[in-house]
């Protein structure tokens, strides 16, 4: 049998041990007394080194050993460990619930009793926001600073971080900021006598031209006229309601509805004040820009057709009809007909370019 036939048929033969391997197999299967020389053979240092390299413990980049879920770290926990973890979780949940309950209680008390002092409110908030339930409240730092304004009066301004957002009870409710009227002027009832007195005071203003007195003039402050009711509201000293938007003139002063702007005395020329003080002139109500509709934009232009009886709407051709009417194709599959003059754009392009 040739070598080729032996190698070709080697896969079909039954696996049998060769003669050279039979003593080693017998030595492994039998006792060590049969061949004592094989048992006394020691492994080389190279083999031990290779085994140590293969069995080196695995380590993650963060220095921890990998946990595949079947090791001692990821195995089943004992009953004692489970009980300990459950108690710890229950304690954390109870502390969180107590802190939320305390915070809700403090907020309710703050809304019911707004007369609480700043110190008490800050202490309760700090105590509720602390991590541990037994944390001692810290005293709020005093951030109040005294600032002296240009009139020589000292005012106390406190930091918004340590003060609650509570409006004082004596805050003036005048939305226009006019010092000539009481603070809560929009709560007063309608008084026709007071309105008549105000109109008489307006009529007493000088009508004719004349020099103005600049002794008590302050630069940057324009004379403020009493508020006039907007259209649709009954006349009264209340002025526009507090929810109406307030417009400002070029000097930064509030500008009332239906009231012409008062000029600022910035020159020595006489100023005629009869426009705003004359009771005989009718009041001009400005038109509402929301109700104004341009008729030219609302309806399309109409052209009279002499041949027909009714008007015809002037319509423009659409883009599709314009494209179809302006383009006539004289070519078919890239080639022009014999009756037309061939153009360079209509000729077929070669494929090798």
From Swiss-Prot:
A GO BP entry: nuclear-transcribed mRNA catabolic process, nonsense-mediated decay
Q: Which UniProt keywords apply?
A: Cytoplasm, mRNA processing, Nonsense-mediated mRNA decay, RNA-binding
Question: Signal sequence span per UniProt?
Answer: none
Q: Where is the composition biased (Basic and acidic residues)?
A: 89-100
Q: Does the keyword RNA-binding apply?
A: yes
Q: Where is the composition biased (Pro residues)?
A: 224-244
Q: Which GO terms describe its cellular component?
A: cytoplasm
Q: Which gene name belongs to this protein?
A: EDC1
Q: Name one GO molecular function term.
A: RNA binding
Q: Where is the composition biased (Polar residues)?
A: 1-34, 305-318, 342-353
Instruction: Report the source organism.
Output: Candida glabrata (strain ATCC 2001 / BCRC 20586 / JCM 3761 / NBRC 0622 / NRRL Y-65 / CBS 138) (Yeast)
* Protein task: mRNA-binding protein which stimulates mRNA decapping.
Predominantly, its location class is: cytoplasm
UniProt subcellular location: Cytoplasm
Official protein name in the record: Enhancer of mRNA-decapping protein 1
Looking at the record, which segments are called Disordered? 1-100, 129-156, 169-189, 218-253, 296-353
Q: Which InterPro entries match?
A: PNRC-like_rgn
